[in-house]
A protein has these predicted regions:
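N-terminal Rossmann-like dinucleotide/flavin-binding domain of flavoprotein oxidoreductases
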Residues: 1-7
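Short, hydrophobic/aromatic-rich segments at coil-to-beta transitions
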Residues: 22-27, 76-78
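General beta-strand recognition
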Residues: 26-28, 97, 163-164
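A conserved short coil-to-beta-strand element within the FAD-binding core of flavoproteins
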Residues: 10-25
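General small-molecule cofactor/ligand-binding pocket signal
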Residues: 7-9, 136
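C-terminal catalytic lobe of FAD-dependent flavoproteins
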Residues: 127-201
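Active-site substrate-recognition segment that forms the wall
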Residues: 33-34, 38-160
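Alpha-helix N-cap/helix-start capping motif
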Residues: 12, 44-45, 177
Length: 201
């Protein structure tokens, strides 16, 4: 991507937008201003906060999901297991991911013993062999929830050059490629790969 003239700036929190009379001009960060003719708000659970300065209220809320990771040998679990909003995902190195909770607790990313116990119990119900393995890690993340579970993929209705791609909730990995392609078509002014109306809020 760098060969196309793109500069990647990682681990740089965006604190606000640079807005002018004729649209968006960039973003504000702790390291200063980054200028751009087009800006995409893809801030997950924080997207609504970034849009506040534009006068747009987007009903995106943080939904906490806690997960655990087992240390095991390869092939203890050989395929993904899905059951009642829970999943068990084997990794190539033998580690096994189990998730996840769905908690309406605002921007709180802390973990709880109750969630760990519930995930461990569910993991051992689905894969009894996991009872013999150690839980290596327990963490939480925040997902961007939308009222009807449908993401927002659109151009800002009033600000030229400002685009939005958020609200994928638990389906970010599943919907990511199609979502990015639809947004790319919008950014480039091309015929979209699918009707964007359902994602326009």
């Amino acid at each position: 991507i760098e060969n196309l003239g793109v500069t990647l700036v990682e681990h740089m929190p965006v604190n606000g937008l640079v807005l002018g009379e004729n649209g968006v001009h960039g973003v504000l960060t702790e390291q200063g201003e980054f200028n751009a003719e087009r800006v995409v708000i893809a801030g997950g659970a924080w997207s609504a906060r970034l849009l506040e300065s534009t006068g747009m209220t987007l009903p995106i809320r943080p939904v906490r999901g806690q997960m655990i990771l087992y240390r095991a040998e390869p092939n203890v679990v050989q395929r993904i297991v899905l059951s009642r909003d829970r999943y068990v995902i084997p990794r190539r190195d033998g580690r096994i991911l189990v998730g996840s909770t769905t908690e309406e607790v605002g921007f709180d990313k802390s973990t709880t013993p109750a969630a760990m116990q519930e995930l461990e119990s569910e993991a051992c119900r689905l894969i009894p062999a996991l009872a013999g393995y150690e839980i290596e890690h327990h963490w939480a993340g925040l997902r961007p929830g939308s009222p009807n579970g449908i993401p927002y993929i659109l151009q800002h209705p009033r600000i030229e050059g400002l685009f939005i791609n958020t609200g994928h909730f638990r389906n970010g990995v599943v919907l990511g490629l199609a979502s990015a392609r639809l947004l790319a078509d919008m950014l480039l002014g091309q015929q979209p790969i699918l009707d964007p109306t359902p994602y326009s809020g």
